[in-house]
Amino acid sequence: MWGLLTVPAPAQARRADSSEFDPDRGWRLHPQVAVRPEPFGALLYHFGTRKLSFLKNRTILAVVQTLADYPDIRSACRGAGVDDCDQDPYLHALSVLAGSNMLVPRQTT
């Protein structure tokens, strides 16, 4: 019974990993993710995990498509026209994408 209530060691290690979602750092699409724009937003497909995600509007699509152009996620949101006070739902959506490996931290050089 105790094993059902504890977090397995690999998940704990993953949480302490440097890839933990931080909107103040640079992120990018995983190289195995394809983006297909749609009238409602977009479909994201990860060829490595075979996971499909939906972006529900064009604004979040603009943020995802321009992540490489900005030093951090907050700046990408601003660039897509999302004011700082309105960023919470976008940051949550992006954290979910990072948690599912659709987004990965950008390497610093």
Curated annotation (Swiss-Prot):
Top-level taxonomic group: Bacteria
Function noted in UniProt: Peptide chaperone involved in the biosynthesis of the enzyme cofactor mycofactocin (MFT). Binds MftA and MftC with high affinity, and is essential for MftC activity on MftA, likely via the formation of a ternary complex.
Family: Belongs to the peptide chaperone MftB family.
InterPro entries membership: MftB
Name the UniProt record assigns to this protein: Peptide chaperone MftB
Upper lineage: Bacteria, Bacillati, Actinomycetota, Actinomycetes, Mycobacteriales
